[in-house]
């Protein structure tokens, strides 16, 4: 029985599950930077060598969104007209995960979901993404995100 199956079995039995979160993560997926002018932001990062990996609209939030890629670094920038435009402008760091449900259960079991966030879906990329966000001890946002 693999670790994942064993942990699912333990969860179903109501047992304490000490899961290694590293089993379900593959690294940083992207860094989120809000902007008041997405075209200016895209142009700036293109001058640094970034290429547009995806440009779309988050219709739910009425935001223009662009994912900009330079080698293995991906920046998600989104125009929300509420960016503070000051130092510390990074909004969140997203960790790429293989199984959003397992990670969510782990975060809940460890009582780390201080924001009480739930798993959301956005129709980005080919098949969409599912994600949720927690808050770290310094008020930083940590997003867990799975490409579908």
Indicate where each model-derived feature is located:
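Short, solvent-exposed loop/turn elements at beta->coil junctions and helix N-caps
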Residues: 55-58, 80-81, 119-124
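Conserved small/polar residues in nucleotide/adenosyl-binding loops
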Residues: 1-5
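Vicinal oxygen chelate
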Residues: 10-15, 19-22, 26-37, 66-67, 84-148
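Structural preference for long, well-ordered alpha-helical segments within the folded cores
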Residues: 43-47, 106, 138
């Amino acid at each position: 029985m693999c670790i994942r199956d064993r942990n699912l079995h333990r969860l179903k039995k109501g047992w304490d599950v000490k899961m290694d979160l590293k089993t379900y993560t593959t690294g940083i997926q992207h860094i989120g930077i809000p902007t008041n002018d997405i075209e200016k932001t895209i142009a700036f990062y293109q001058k640094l060598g970034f290429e547009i990996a995806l440009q779309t609209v988050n219709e739910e939030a009425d935001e223009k969104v662009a994912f900009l890629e330079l080698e293995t670094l991906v920046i998600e920038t989104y125009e929300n007209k509420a960016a503070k435009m000051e130092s510390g402008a990074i909004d969140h760091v997203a960790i790429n995960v293989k199984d959003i449900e397992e990670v969510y259960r782990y975060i809940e079991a460890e009582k780390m979901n201080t924001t009480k966030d739930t798993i959301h879906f956005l129709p980005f990329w080919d098949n969409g993404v599912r994600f949720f966000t927690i808050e770290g001890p310094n008020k930083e946002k940590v997003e867990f995100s799975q490409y579908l």
